[in-house]
Design a protein with these regions (language model features):
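Carbohydrate-active catalytic/glycan-binding domains of CAZyme proteins
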Residues: 4, 10-519
Length: 519
């Protein structure tokens, strides 16, 4: 674990002023740390990482007032290798992040024995412990259980094939650790095995090259998300690709499965105790590009929200959301489609994009959703620079969420930068905007175009040219061509020097829009 004092370079600063919100806004200074962090990507520069080298984050607000972030083992140039697993950092303001180091020293002792126990039951030869670097340590989820108790559910993928060439890949596990004090990064105590991949194919684990549709596993035991319902029930939501996302109830005291788990191979049906299907892109499809479920409950709307990552992580990654009144579904999209029975999930929440005067961002998904306890909600994920720059750069992104009148979460297009939220006036809306139709196109970085609002409430340029606009000052909503655009002040990360601007986000039944005011 990193024991030294946190070290921020001069770039990692921001400030606001005392006084009224208008005075604070006038004095606002934006964060100026670099998006392309290659110069500080090395392990010996970790004290300056801030949000560099973040992938698949999970965020929890600790009792000490810090936000703690944990993540997949991934970094530019694999800088983390040999330094433990599920690395952590913390922040008081969601902008300046202190590196804390690993939470897990080495591969848990239960993994290989549990793997061989399952292999023995399947009539397969035992395996030896492989080099630690060959295991995957992926996608943790950390939640507060109560004062003085936190749980981390984590994924470990095992190397190799089930029975040599021509057979399916080895299984994965979800395990769990507990901690009583998040500021003690050495305080995580491993509690062991939770669940593994479940199959409905018995011992039919042979596979031909490229035959993904005939996947041996039905449920994939990675990408856990953990929730405690208002009634006090504990649930684990997990899954990646394969047949979809499942919900498994947990014992609220131990955090272990509520039902005893039988053998993870069966014929005809996957064992029911391994989970109940809550989301699938296509019923019966055993290899579908969806993963990274994140489940939250909003007491104001009384809905459960299931966020998902779609497509491959390098560039096409995009985020979707559906909602339900019940933890086990059915989950419906904004278009009314039942994703529990099988449908593509809408709306699109994030998508590869590009504002002018920038390279833009891709791979923006596998998110964490969290709130500050005061009604303010946030979205965190990695973002990657496009391949034309360096797609291996993975920077942590934190964005604000606004909720629509109909109870859907809108993620703001610009990253959070603690901009004072002085009321937006109608006069500020007149002029040029960068407008993005963020509707889904596989792997395409959606670019902005100019939209001009005139002082006579007309649109003189852009997609909605010759339409009219109006402004609801009380609710801070700009309506253009009948579409409600939810406004917020955020940092203009593309400006040089960075400053503040006004942004918007919007959903219709089949469209997502992002935009920002041009300077």
């Amino acid at each position: 674990i990193y024991q030294g004092d946190v070290v921020y370079s001069p770039e990692f600063t921001f400030s606001t002023a005392d006084g009224t919100l208008d005075e604070q806004l006038a004095a606002y200074q934006a964060p100026i740390y670099p998006d392309n962090y290659i110069a500080i990507a090395d392990w010996n520069m970790r004290g300056q990482w801030n949000l560099a080298n973040v992938h698949d984050p999970t965020v929890v607000l600790g009792e000490d007032g810090y936000y703690y972030m944990y993540q997949t083992d991934a970094s530019y140039g694999n800088a983390h290798e040999g330094h433990g697993h599920f690395h952590a950092r913390r922040s008081k303001n969601l902008i300046d992040w202190e590196y804390l180091g690993r939470t897990m020293k080495e591969l848990p002792g239960w993994v290989v024995p549990k793997l061989n126990e399952i292999r023995q039951g399947m009539g397969l030869q035992p395996v030896a412990t492989a080099a630690e670097i060959s295991y995957g340590f992926w996608a943790p989820c950390v939640r507060k259980v109560r004062n003085g108790l936190y749980r981390m559910y984590y994924s470990i993928t095992c190397p190799g094939l089930l029975n040599g060439e021509g057979t399916w890949s080895e299984r994965a596990f979800i395990g769990m650790m507990e901690n009583t004090n998040l500021s003690n990064n050495d305080g995580w105590v491993d509690k062991g095995y939770i669940v593994t991949n479940a199959s409905d194919k018995g011992f039919e684990f042979n596979v031909t090259a490229g035959d993904w549709a005939n996947c041996y596993y039905k449920w994939n035991a990675i990408d856990p998300s953990y929730i405690i319902t208002p009634e006090g029930a504990h649930w684990l939501i997990y899954g990646s690709w394969h047949s979809g996302i499942v919900a498994m109830e947990l014992n609220e005291v131990t955090g272990m499965p509520k039902q005893s788990l039988g053998i993870p191979w069966a014929e005809g049906n996957a064992p029911a105790e391994y989970g109940q299907l809550i989301a699938t892109r296509q019923a019966g499809n055993r290899w579908q590009a969806s993963e990274g479920p994140e489940i939250v409950y909003n007491p104001q709307t009384e809905y459960y929200y299931l966020f998902m990552a779609y497509d491959a992580l390098e560039t096409p990654y995009n985020t979707r959301v559906a909602r339900s009144k019940s933890i086990t579904g059915p989950y419906l999209g904004i278009d009314g489609a039942n994703v529990t029975e099988g449908a593509d999930m809408y709306p699109v929440v994030t998508h590869p994009y590009k504002f002018a005067k920038s390279e833009g961002w891709v791979g923006i998904s596998h998110c964490a959703i969290f709130d500050d306890g005061n009604g303010n909600w946030y979205y965190a994920s990695q973002g990657r620079l496009p391949e034309s720059v360096d797609n291996a750069v993975m920077l942590g992104h934190v964005r604000s969420i606004r909720w629509t009148k109909d109870g859907w979460p809108l993620v703001m297009p610009e990253r959070y930068g603690a901009v004072p939220q002085a009321a937006i006036t109608e006069e500020e809306l007149i002029g040029d905007w960068e407008h993005i139709d963020l509707s889904y196109v596989f792997g395409q970085q959606k670019e902005s175009s100019t939209m001009t609002l005139t002082d006579d409430h007309k649109v003189s340029e852009g997609t909605w040219k010759d339409s009219s606009w109006s402004f609801d000052a009380e609710n801070q909503i700009l309506t253009v061509n009948g579409v409600d655009l939810y406004l917020q002040r955020e940092t203009d990360w593309e400006a040089k020097p960075r400053t503040h601007t006004i942004v918007y986000a919007s959903y219709t039944d089949n469209k997502t829009y992002w935009g920002k005011k041009s300077k």
